[in-house]
Amino acid sequence: MSRTLPHLLSPDPASPFPPAERALREPDGLLAIGGDLHPQRLLNAYAHGIFPWFSDGQPLLWWSPNPRTVFRTDAIHLSSRFRRQLRTCTWTLRADTAFAQVIAACASSPRPGQDGTWITDQMQEAYLDLHRRGYAHSVEVFDGARLVGGIYGVAIGQMFFGESMFSGASGGSKIALAALAAKLHGLGWPLIDAQVENAHLMRLGAQRLPREQFLQHVATQVALPEPPGSWTQRYGERHASGLAGVRLT
């Protein structure tokens, strides 16, 4: 008999999640309800292929959809026209220098078909805490001193779990994603989790993985040694124009 109700989480942030395979089929991927956004619970969730997604006024909802949307770090789609534009682009790229601004911009960016944002104040505080602990990271795109794009997510071991991205100017989010993918590919990290598909992600080269395959990949990657910490020095400052010649597809 299939389950029709999600698992109710214990108040203890150290309590385990149920196996992701027990997630509901309708709504797709809903696994658990309740709990909190304590860093221990969040990191445990991501390490098992689970993420929080809820709106203001809703209880905390935890998901593991099937299939899972991912990006291969060597397969971000940049059109020939976009690459030509990149060659003369004067924007610069940095990491972990404006995390709070990136997550705030993602929260305030309108999304087609969405009324309001799921990046609530509660969510922002939780990910700022993970950032201070060295687990949540951002890649930022600057036009001079102005932030024009960015992406943020969570890194555990050698697996990056993307959360959201934004464009403050045309192409800003695409450049942030491509820059993140190029850096991770160079480090040998093969995938970026993109959670749930939408048309924009698919145009950028996102792919669908069966949940079982995704969970196997996550288990392998999060177990690889990679200490938490700031990415600012590790990433350095780069020029967006350098992405024009990076082979990602």
From Swiss-Prot:
GO terms for molecular function: leucyl-tRNA--protein transferase activity. Residues 1-21 are annotated as: Disordered. Its EC number is 2.3.2.6. It catalyses: N-terminal L-lysyl-[protein] + L-leucyl-tRNA(Leu) = N-terminal L-leucyl-L-lysyl-[protein] + tRNA(Leu) + H(+); N-terminal L-arginyl-[protein] + L-leucyl-tRNA(Leu) = N-terminal L-leucyl-L-arginyl-[protein] + tRNA(Leu) + H(+); L-phenylalanyl-tRNA(Phe) + an N-terminal L-alpha-aminoacyl-[protein] = an N-terminal L-phenylalanyl-L-alpha-aminoacyl-[protein] + tRNA(Phe). It comes from the Bacteria. SUPFAM superfamilies: Acyl-CoA N-acyltransferases (Nat). Belongs to the L/F-transferase family. This is Leucyl/phenylalanyl-tRNA--protein transferase. It comes from Xanthomonas campestris pv. campestris (strain B100).
